[in-house]
Amino acid sequence: MGNKESKYLEMCSEEAWLNIPNIFKCIFIRKLFYNKWLKYQEKKLKKSLKLLSFYHPKKDFVGIRDMLHMAPGGSYFITDNITEEFLMLVVKHPEDGSAEFTKLCLKGSCIVIDGYYYDTLHIFLSETPDIYKYPLIRYDR
């Protein structure tokens, strides 16, 4: 058995666990459960976001621009695969055709928009009257 394997087995043994002070055990267990809870909350959020109507563009900007040019006025969620890297809320104004982009970030069970944390998108939409008056509609090519 190699040196690394024996150290790992020694670390995982019950005797080694018993030698660790209780305060460190508590910190370790809390961190372990907290991380699992955060992952669960993030999964729950992603699941609820998938229930909304998303437009899944190609990864290039040209596809997004073409979609917005052809789309009627309204609000659109644009994402490639519902990740933190690329999740946006786009509002296209029906009068002049201009569009406003807001990048959304997932943080645990919250969505971070412009540095503010929101538990649900409904809270964000109700606090933002300019966006709320436009319907969240699905657009398919």
UniProtKB/Swiss-Prot annotation:
Name listed for the protein in its UniProt record: Protein MGF 100-2L
Physiological role: Plays a role in virus cell tropism, and may be required for efficient virus replication in macrophages.
Organism: African swine fever virus (strain Badajoz 1971 Vero-adapted)
Stated family: Belongs to the asfivirus MGF 100 family.
Keywords: Early protein
Induction section of the entry: Expressed in the early phase of the viral replicative cycle.
Domain of life per record: Viruses
